[in-house]
Amino acid sequence: PGPDVKCVCCQDGKECPCKGGECCITGSCCKEGDGLCCGKCSNAACKCADGCKCGSGCSCTLGNCTC
């Protein structure tokens, strides 16, 4: 298995796990409990700049990104 992929949710800064790593394709994640999708993708190998929408020219501040 690859790195544990998470999304940093935009509302409160909490991290929540993404099912199937989908957040690194869509750039969003579903917040625990409320089902809202928001946030920016990150994982152990990549940290994206603010406003990054993975899949459309993600600019990475650290590491290499498949975005």
From Swiss-Prot:
It comes from the Eukaryota. Metallothioneins have a high content of cysteine residues that bind various heavy metals. This is Metallothionein-A. InterPro entries: Metalthion_4_echinoid/annelid, Metalthion_4_echinoidea, Metalthion_dom_sf. One of its GO terms (molecular function) is metal ion binding. Keywords: Metal-binding, Metal-thiolate cluster. It comes from Sphaerechinus granularis. Belongs to the metallothionein superfamily. Type 4 family.
